[in-house]
């Protein structure tokens, strides 16, 4: 199924509709924040034209009826605080779909999952309330458009890169990933790591959308602290970079976005947009970041007047103070949201919007439609050759009396696991990365030969995109994020019941575990929130504990490996093998559990493999039982 760029000239006729949808989104942002008195108006307002163009132009291939389709393009709101932007847009889109379904009864307008998956204007009244829509991006229920949970600075960027890698490695590089961020969030170090790695992996399907307005939270321009501009920030990393001078102009936004997204080549790309933080909100710059206008204040009503005059509507209580009772304030806000939605009384506009969303949704392929897709629809992770310790081959174990490090147990079971993938599924089970410590931590077993099965080798963007060991550098944070993004990418046509994708593994010193915690924490949340099946993230805490004492206390870390336990019950399994033969049984058993993260702590020095029978010890197979 070839993917061709939409015709820009044909799209231009729709820009008046896009402008109307964007104006409605602006009003939804303002009204929900006026009511809730919490949230982030500035960055939400500045990104409206980018989001409308992305979702209606065809640059992003997605289905509003089911955004979590396996081969849908992925959207990651790295600027996770800008959820009002997406909620407001979805409320407009879903209202058009609802009206067309009620008018025609045609199932093509029906949302998968019904009310539980439909974000309507009524839901805007629940912002930042318990059980309502979240203040930062969470991938669940009504907000499945978010491919992952985001909010902490930059955390979504490496995760998005991992998603792009999953599609590329599966032969589905035409499926794209879009990561929306501002230049403030972009200063986080994980962006530096992610940009290096995305270039090195040749992720031509990875797209940054950067909102550039020189403002953040504190009262100083970012240009006073950060040299250059987005063109330099991304060109210098080998990316394909294009800029938009007026980020509020639909023509310039759309033409530049399409030109950059559909360009050929394996360079990751960034499209940046020169915008005004707080555009149209009455307060611009840093002051618009995280505070709504006082409820029903004069400046709030001023932002409504322009819209009311433009579209000849009347807002309830216009110019008046906030109603005294909470119920009256809620009723007033609901009435005004309905007034915004009344623009969809224009049947031509409503039909255009709903039909355009359906048209784009219908373009999302199934696995059968995609030429060159490398994964079968069979879920190998249900294969007990991988998850039943009794099925592990004797060759992975060492004889009593041998001097071997625990990490060698990982090397053997890792090579065996991917040999099962080669033999049965013609693909690796696990894609691995390390912080320039692949051999040192023995995570390189995932790319090595096992028996008569040839290993998949090192990944190389030019010579071996089928490799199973990524050539990542000393980028612990982004390595963890990439592994989590990889493991969360379910390409199945039935993602709730079947997993088609990869497991991921990453390693560094156990004492540096804190560098990996942030992405793992969000992956744990995603696994809790999402109705879809996920893969596994295998967290190798290598060279762990005082056995690494020759590196001194800066490296052996008595307490920092405990970070792998900082998850809710049932979200992580920690493995601390006594000797190398315990690694295989314990790891296989853990991977067979319904737990998204498995943290394996291995040591570096050789230890003598015990003669368990002579010592009266139980079998190393008992390690599979856990503590």
Language model features with spans:
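Conserved acidic/glycine
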Residues: 1-53, 185, 189, 207-209, ...
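Cofactor-binding active-site loop characterized by glycine-rich and histidine/acidic residues
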Residues: 10, 14, 18, 25-30, ...
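Active-site nucleophile and cofactor-binding loops and adjacent substrate-binding regions
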Residues: 36-48, 75-81, 138-159, 181-186, ...
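Glycine-rich phosphate/pyrophosphate-binding loops
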Residues: 63-64, 167-178, 488-515, 535
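Short acidic, glycine/serine/threonine-rich loops at helix termini
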Residues: 87-91, 189-193, 217-223, 252-257, ...
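A glycine-rich helix N-cap at a beta->alpha junction
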Residues: 95-107, 117-119, 123-126, 199-211, ...
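Active-site phosphate/pyrophosphate-binding segments
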Residues: 133-134, 525, 530-627
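Thiamine diphosphate
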Residues: 145, 149-269, 545-562
């Amino acid at each position: 199924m070839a993917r061709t760029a939409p015709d820009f000239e044909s799209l231009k006729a729709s820009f008046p509709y896009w402008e109307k949808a964007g104006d409605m989104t602006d009003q939804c942002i303002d009204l929900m924040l006026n009511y809730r008195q919490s949230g982030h108006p500035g960055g939400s307002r500045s990104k409206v034209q980018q989001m409308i163009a992305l979702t209606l132009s065809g640059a992003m291939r997605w289905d509003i009826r089911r955004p979590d389709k396996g081969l849908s393009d992925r959207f990651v709101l790295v600027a996770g605080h800008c959820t009002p932007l997406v909620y407001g847009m979805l409320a407009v889109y879903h209202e058009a779909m609802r009206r067309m379904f009620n008018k025609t009864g045609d199932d093509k307008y029906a949302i998968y999952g019904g009310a539980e998956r439909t974000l309507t204007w009524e839901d805007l009244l629940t912002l930042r309330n318990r059980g309502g829509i979240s203040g930062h991006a969470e991938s669940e229920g009504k907000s499945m458009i978010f491919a992952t949970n985001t909010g902490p600075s930059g955390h979504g960027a490496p995760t998005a890169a991992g998603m792009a890698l999953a599609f590329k490695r599966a032969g589905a590089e035409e499926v794209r990933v879009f990561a929306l961020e501002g230049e403030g969030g972009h200063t986080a170090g994980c962006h530096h790591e992610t940009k290096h790695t995305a270039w090195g992996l040749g992720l031509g399907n990875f797209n940054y959308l950067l909102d550039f307005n020189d403002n953040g939270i504190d009262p100083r321009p970012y240009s006073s602290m950060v040299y250059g501009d987005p063109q330099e920030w991304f060109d210098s990393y080998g990316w394909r970079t294009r800029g938009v001078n007026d980020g509020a102009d639909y023509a310039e936004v759309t033409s530049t976005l399409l030109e950059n997204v559909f360009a050929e080549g394996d360079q990751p790309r960034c499209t940046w947009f020169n915008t005004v933080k707080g555009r149209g909100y009455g307060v611009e710059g840093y002051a618009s970041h995280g505070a709504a206008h006082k409820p029903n204040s004069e400046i709030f009503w001023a932002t409504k007047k322009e819209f009311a005059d433009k579209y000849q509507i009347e807002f309830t209580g216009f110019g008046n103070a906030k109603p005294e009772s909470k119920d009256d304030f809620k009723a007033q806000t609901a009435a005004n949201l309905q007034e915004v939605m009344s623009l969809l009384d224009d049947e031509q506009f409503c039909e255009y919007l709903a039909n355009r969303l359906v048209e784009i949704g219908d373009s999302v392929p199934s696995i059968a439609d995609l030429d060159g897709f490398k994964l079968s629809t069979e879920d190998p992770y249900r294969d007990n050759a991988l998850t039943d310790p009794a099925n592990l081959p004797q060759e992975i174990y060492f004889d009593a009396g041998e001097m071997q490090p625990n990490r060698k147990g990982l090397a053997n079971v890792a090579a065996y696991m991917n040999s099962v993938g080669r033999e049965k599924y013609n693909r690796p089970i696990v894609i691995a990365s390390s912080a320039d410590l692949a051999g040192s931590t023995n995570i390189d077993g995932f790319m090595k030969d096992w028996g008569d099965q040839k290993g998949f080798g090192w990944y190389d963007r030019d010579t071996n995109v089928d490799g199973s060991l990524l050539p990542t550098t000393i980028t612990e944070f982004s390595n963890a994020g990439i592994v989590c993004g990889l493991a969360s990418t379910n390409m199945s046509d039935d993602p709730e019941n079947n997993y088609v994708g990869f497991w991921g593994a990453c390693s560094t010193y156990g004492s540096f575990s804190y560098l990996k915690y942030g992405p793992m924490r969000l992956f744990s949340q995603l696994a809790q929130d999402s109705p879809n099946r996920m893969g596994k993230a295998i967290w190798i805490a290598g060279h762990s504990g005082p056995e690494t004492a020759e590196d001194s206390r800066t490296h052996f870390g008595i307490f920092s490996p405990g970070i792998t336990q900082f998850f809710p019950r049932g979200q992580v399994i920690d493995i601390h093998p006594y000797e190398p033969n315990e690694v295989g049984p314990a790891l296989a058993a853990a991977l067979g559990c319904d737990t998204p993260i498995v943290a394996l702590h291995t040591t570096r020095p050789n230890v003598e493999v015990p003669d368990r029978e002579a010592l009266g010890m139980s079998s190393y197979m008992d390690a599979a039982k856990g503590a």
